[in-house]
């Protein structure tokens, strides 16, 4: 499985997210500019550590 398909599968784990929506999320994430993607990952990590 390539990285993109792994990302799709990870989004499918979200409640209420089916295969088409997961693919849309994955396309959105990979199309982000580097700065926004980096901030998104940093924010996710911080939220996980503090919640």
Label the predicted regions.
Residues 2-13, 23-51:
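Cys/His-rich Zn2+-binding cysteine-cluster or related metal-binding knuckle/ribbon modules and their
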